[in-house]
């Protein structure tokens, strides 16, 4: 009986964590959700990816609004594998896997009127967390800082973001 109760509690915890992650995603501002969606599209396009991934949590968010509906976004976040296969349409029942490492993603891009601009090309860098080195993290941030938009524009990481 105790084993059944334990199994029920663990199952409820897994379902709640999946629901909390979906809630965390839905609470992101729209301009950040579009970046997460872009990273997920690139991730599932790789043939080696077998599972569906969901947004897990934000590590760092930074944005600059320059006016005239132009903005620059930097977002560092985790994706987590689910037990659902790649290509799953209804992800509401997808429970997180705890046997796969998190994927650490950093993305920076320019927006105009709430849409991601094609130029300059958005930068998306996602890697399994254990493989991510401090040098790689520095390279990511440097790349986003030096993305050349137009002379005189602010850089993405010039503002102080929120965690």
Specify the residue positions occupied by each region the protein language model found.
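Short, flexible/disordered secondary-structure transition segments
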Residues: 8, 46-54, 91
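Compact beta-sheet-dominated globular domain cores
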Residues: 85-163
């Amino acid at each position: 009986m105790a084993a059944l109760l334990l199994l029920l509690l663990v199952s409820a915890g897994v379902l709640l964590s999946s629901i909390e992650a979906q809630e965390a995603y839905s609470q992101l501002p729209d301009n950040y959700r579009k970046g997460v969606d872009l990273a997920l599209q690139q991730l599932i396009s790789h043939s080696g990816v077998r599972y569906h991934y969901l947004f897990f949590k934000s590590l760092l968010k930074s944005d600059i609004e320059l006016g005239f509906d132009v903005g620059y976004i930097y977002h560092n976040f985790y994706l987590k594998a689910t037990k659902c296969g790649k290509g799953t349409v209804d992800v509401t029942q997808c429970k997180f896997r705890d046997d796969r490492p998190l994927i650490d993603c950093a993305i920076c891009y320019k927006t105009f009127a709430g849409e991601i601009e094609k130029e300059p090309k958005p930068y998306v860098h996602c890697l399994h967390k254990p493989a991510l080195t401090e040098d790689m993290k520095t390279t990511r941030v440097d790349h986003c800082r030096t993305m050349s938009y137009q002379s005189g524009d602010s850089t993405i990481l010039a503002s102080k973001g929120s965690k």
